[in-house]
Design a protein with these regions (language model features):
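ALDH superfamily catalytic-core signature
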Residues: 1-112
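Conserved active-site and cofactor/substrate-binding residues in soluble primary-metabolism enzymes
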Residues: 7-11, 35, 39, 43, ...
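General beta-strand structural signal in soluble alpha/beta enzymes
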Residues: 36, 56-58, 104-106, 177-180, ...
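Structural motif
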Residues: 37-39, 107-109, 157-159, 263-266
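Short, aromatic/basic amphipathic alpha-helical patches
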Residues: 43-50, 166-170, 271-280
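Conserved C-terminal structural/oligomerization subdomain of aldehyde/semialdehyde dehydrogenase
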Residues: 95-231
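ATP/NTP phosphate-donor binding region
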Residues: 232-288
Length: 288
């Protein structure tokens, strides 16, 4: 989720905590990182702490958390901690946290493989990344998607409607949520009009056949009985066609510089078509 400086800060932080703590972070659509503009970074951190979240900043503590949360050999989450509470995970990592801790937030500088906690964690563990502004925030959000989430879900918290549109266009995600908790928003219906589902398509970005939330409709075999029909076939004809004997004399009374003369090849061969053209000062004549 990208948290831009114009957002309603308290709502944005509440949404992220609500989303990431729901079902202990097991919803695949939940945030894996909060990318926060530098202008509001300290204020956002304080708000997270007010929501019983613990900020982990020391490199040694982050390294301990990485070892417990991730299987770095597989660049994937450690299955042993999936769905566990923040307190249980902290204990496994040898970190002391207060009772009632909802989330563990690890401060990392960027969304790259050099910082494994940017990967999908399926737990109440969230990366916290500072951005230098909109462009940097967008790039880091793209980096998050490229770390195994391409085609899935992206979130922006901002009151700037132009940025909402730009973010939606730029992110390679099939669900782009605005000012919403990612887990509850991504699975649909509660915060938007998307189809409620726990199976989310990632489109061609993620090598999926569909890009929407999977529902019972996708399980139906829809038959089509198609009866034969001919497509419309037509051709344009002149508004007037003169065909009786001596009708060529009507050219004296018609204001036209282009006519089509229908005749046999002999009429052309012996020059009669050219004679008509000269006598009536026609600049062009189609001979058929």
């Amino acid at each position: 989720a990208y948290v831009e400086k114009s957002c309603i800060l308290k709502r944005a932080v509440n949404d992220i905590v609500l989303s990431k703590s729901f079902d202990n972070g097991m919803i695949c659509a939940s945030e894996q990182a909060a990318i926060v503009d530098a202008a509001i970074y300290d204020e956002v951190k304080a708000e997270f702490e007010a929501h019983q979240c613990v900020i982990i900043s020391k490199k040694a503590d982050i390294a301990k958390l990485e070892k417990v949360v991730l299987n770095e050999a597989r660049t994937a989450v450690n299955g042993a901690i999936v769905g566990h509470s923040a307190i249980e995970i902290a204990e496994k990592a040898g970190l002391k946290v207060p009772a009632g801790t909802k989330l563990l937030l690890a401060e990392i500088p960027d969304a790259t493989m050099e910082h494994p906690l940017a990967l999908e964690k399926l737990s109440p563990v969230l990366a916290l990344i500072k951005s230098d502004g909109v462009e940097d925030g967008f790039k880091k959000a793209e980096g998050m998607l490229n770390l195994g989430g391409i085609g899935h879900t992206a979130v922006i918290h901002t009151e700037n409607e132009e940025l909402q549109l730009q973010y939606g266009i730029r992110m390679k995600a099939c669900r782009v949520l605005v000012n919403s908790p990612s887990a509850e928003g991504g699975i649909g219906n509660i915060y938007n009009n998307m189809i409620p589902s726990l199976t989310l398509g990632c489109g061609s970005y993620g090598h999926n056949s569909i890009s929407h939330n999977v529902s019972s409709f996708d399980l139906l075999n829809v038959k089509t009985l198609s009866k034969r029909r001919n497509n419309i076939q037509w051709f344009r004809v002149p508004t007037k066609i003169f065909f009786e004997k001596d009708s060529i004399t009507y050219l004296r009374h018609i204001e036209a510089d282009r006519v089509m003369l229908v005749c046999d090849p002999g009429m052309v061969q012996f020059g009669y078509a050219d004679l008509v053209k000269r006598n009536w000062n026609l600049t062009a004549i189609d001979q058929q």
